[in-house]
Structures are given as C-alpha cells and as structure tokens.
Design a protein with these regions (language model features):
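Conserved structural motif at the start of ABC-family nucleotide-binding domains
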Residues: 20, 34-37, 146
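The feature captures the beta-strand-to-loop junction immediately N-terminal to the Walker
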Residues: 51-53
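Helix-to-loop junction immediately C-terminal to a conserved catalytic motif
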Residues: 66
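Catalytic Walker B motif of ABC-type/P-loop ATPase nucleotide-binding domains
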Residues: 174-178
Length: 180
C-alpha cells in the first residue's frame, strides 16, 4: 500500500483540495453549545496552531474533527471526504490529561498502536511494525526507553512517545492537542 497522503489525494482526484475543512461546526454538551458555527480551512502542507485561553474550545474542536465528540451541526472533511473515510491519514497526539498513564504497557507497544490503522485490529504487529516504531522513537530521541513502562517516564517523555505514535502512522495530517 502506498503513502496514505497520495492515496487520499488520488481518491479525490482534485489537486489542491483542503487538508481539513470544517463548516458551521456546532458542539454541545448536555444541550449547551460550547462551540458554534465554527468554520476552518487548512490547506495541505501548512503548519497551523489554534490558540486561545483555557476553556475556549480548542480540545473540543479537535475531538469533533476526529469524531471523538459528536457535533450537533456542521460538517468536517479531511481531504474532501468525511473523517470516517480518512482516519488512516490523520495522526493524533492527545492532551496528557486524557491518557491513563498507569495502564501497564511499554513505550514500544504505545508507538506500535499507531500501526493498527494499517494492520487492522486482528493482525499482530510483526518485524516491520517494530522497526517502524523504533525508527519513530529514534526520531523523537526515545529509542533507549522502548522497553520501559510508559508510567515510568516524565510528562515530556510521555508526550514524545505519543508524538512517535502519530509519526509511525505516516499520516498526511497531524492533530496535536497541547503537545509540548
């Protein structure tokens, strides 16, 4: 299988299609809107940051783009298609507070989780996946910690491991929620 970025663009058949397009997005918690009428257009190849005070809805917007929270209204497109059809082209680094750091897993296992989109849930990772995970750990300077439990790392080290998990996906889009 080829590069997921070229796959997504080839499927659309349109050069220059937006990487992320959000139109009239509204998200509510218990019938109380927390985001409303949000529009966002992100071209391919752009580094972009969403900044704002605590409680402004940055995390909620990322989660809505990823389908982790349900939108009350609006549309989210990734390379011109619904996110459900484009999951494999999006890498995600969550906020530290949303992860169970006491879950008994190694650094290498966490990074290999980034390969499950390509593998599927029923196939076990093999040598190729381990090599890709180790290469991603090397990119973030964490290869020496591969066999260590994720709970034994500092907060910054944990974030670098989750960055490696996103990188191992070879995604066309990376969404990072307070990555540093």
């Amino acid at each position: 299988m080829g590069d997921p970025r070229s796959l997504a663009l080839a499927v659309d058949g349109v050069a220059g299609v937006l990487a992320v397009e959000v139109t009239d997005l509204t998200v509510a918690y218990r019938d109380r809107p927390v985001l409303w009428d949000v529009d966002l257009s992100v071209p391919s190849g752009v580094l972009m940051a969403i900044i704002g005070p605590n409680g402004a809805g940055k995390t909620t917007m990322i989660k809505a783009i990823l389908g982790l929270v349900r939108a009350a209204a609006g549309q989210v497109l990734i390379y011109g298609r619904p996110y459900t059809e484009q999951r494999r082209v999006v890498g995600y680094v969550p906020q530290r507070g949303t992860v169970d750091w006491d879950f008994p897993t190694t650094v290498l296992d966490v990074v290999m989780m980034g390969r499950y989109g390509e593998l599927g849930w029923l196939r076990r990772p093999g040598k190729k996946e381990r090599e890709a995970a180790m290469q991603a750990l090397e990119q973030v300077g964490m290869e020496a910690f591969a066999k260590r439990q994720i709970s034994q790392l500092s907060g910054g080290q944990q974030q670098r491991v989750f960055l490696a998990r996103a990188l191992v996906q070879n995604a066309g889009i990376y969404l990072m929620d307070e990555p540093f």
